[in-house]
């Protein structure tokens, strides 16, 4: 979407790497708190964290001031999603809807599990491979209820409103009809993607069936309500940084100079990326249960 830009700090694929978001005035903002949930009527904003086909597990840093995008770290090592045959990296553009929060203190009535303490996730199924940190408008089509290590982790299915075929997609049944096998592959991917790391398969509510657009929008709205409580300090933030520059009713709102000071304290941008381990391209073969 026009008006937003990114600024990288440090080298990609390094522990210090960060992607900050800026508004149309060039001021630093939080992609979690400052980008509006809606881009237009019935259109949601999406923050792209991971471009399709890539492996680096990039995500909004919810506990860091201004919530830049950074690569996830496990036991001191940068995380890369394995290529679980026949897939290569992420099979959609993957990211989050801003101004949403899956509250870890809220037991979801549909799943019986509490939220995962993150913005709600989005799988964008359009034809364009988006860029890390890109802000796009998406049309919501449906949702999948994943249970990740006992936590509710909703996966919204959506399409970029600028996709040439966006007009043909209005609900989850259109995905089933026009992209046969894609939803089944999505369930399979989420079920097994942690297996190469020695983790068990993930589980799902609703017998791994996708719920429709209206159901998905209701879930998104509920996570938006949880976010409102978070950013206005009406609920326990569980270590999340709510620093923002635009939410007038938030006690965490700061001025542009304070936001700039956060970024200026970090390493400068680096033109060359660090070397990605060669085993990131390895295929993993795993028998489905």
Swiss-Prot record:
Look up the signal peptide feature and give its range. none
Which cofactors?
Mg(2+)
List of residues binding Mg(2+) 1: 116, 121, 153
Highest taxon listed in the record's lineage: Eukaryota
Provide GO CC annotations from the record. cytoplasm
GO MF: inorganic diphosphate phosphatase activity; magnesium ion binding
Q: Name one Pfam family in it.
A: Pyrophosphatase
Query: What is catalysed by this protein?
Result: diphosphate + H2O = 2 phosphate + H(+)
Name the EC number(s): 3.6.1.1
Class of this enzyme: hydrolase
Q: Which residues carry this modification: Phosphoserine?
A: 250
The compartments listed are: Cytoplasm
What are the recorded Gene Ontology BP terms? phosphate-containing compound metabolic process
CDD domains, per database record: pyrophosphatase (cd00412)
Q: Which family does it belong to?
A: Belongs to the PPase family.
- Which PANTHER family does UniProt cross-reference here? INORGANIC PYROPHOSPHATASE
Q: What is this protein called?
A: Inorganic pyrophosphatase
Species of the source: Macaca fascicularis (Crab-eating macaque)
Upper taxonomic lineage = Eukaryota, Metazoa, Chordata, Craniata, Vertebrata
């Amino acid at each position: 979407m026009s008006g937003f830009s990114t600024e990288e700090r440090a080298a990609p694929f390094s522990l210090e790497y960060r992607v900050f978001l800026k508004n149309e005035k060039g001021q630093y903002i939080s992609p979690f708190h400052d980008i509006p949930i809606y881009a237009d009527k019935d259109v949601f904003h999406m923050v792209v964290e991971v471009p399709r086909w890539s492996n680096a597990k990039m995500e909004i840093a919810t506990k860091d001031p201004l919530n830049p995008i950074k690569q996830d770290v496990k036991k001191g090592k940068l995380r890369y999603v394995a290529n679980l045959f026949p897939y290569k990296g992420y099979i959609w553009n993957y990211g989050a809807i801003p101004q949403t929060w899956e509250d870890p203190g809220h037991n979801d009535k549909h799943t019986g599990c509490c939220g995962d303490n993150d913005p709600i996730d989005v799988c964008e199924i359009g034809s364009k491979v988006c860029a890390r940190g890109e802000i796009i408008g998406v049309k919501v089509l449906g949702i999948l209820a994943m249970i990740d290590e006992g936590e509710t982790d909703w996966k919204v299915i959506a399409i970029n409103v600028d996709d040439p075929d966006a007009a043909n997609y209005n609900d989850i049944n259109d995905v089933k009809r026009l992209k046969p096998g894609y939803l089944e592959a999505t369930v399979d991917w989420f079920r097994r993607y942690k297996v190469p790391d020695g983790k068990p398969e993930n589980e799902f509510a609703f017998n791994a069936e996708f719920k429709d657009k209206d159901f998905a929008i209701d879930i998104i709205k509920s996570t938006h309500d949880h976010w409102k409580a978070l950013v206005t300090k009406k609920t326990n933030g569980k270590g999340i940084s709510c620093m923002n520059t635009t939410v007038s009713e938030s006690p965490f709102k700061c001025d542009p100079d304070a936001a700039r000071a956060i970024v200026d304290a970090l390493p400068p941008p680096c033109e060359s990326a660090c070397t990605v381990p060669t085993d990131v391209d390895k295929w993993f073969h795993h028998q489905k249960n």
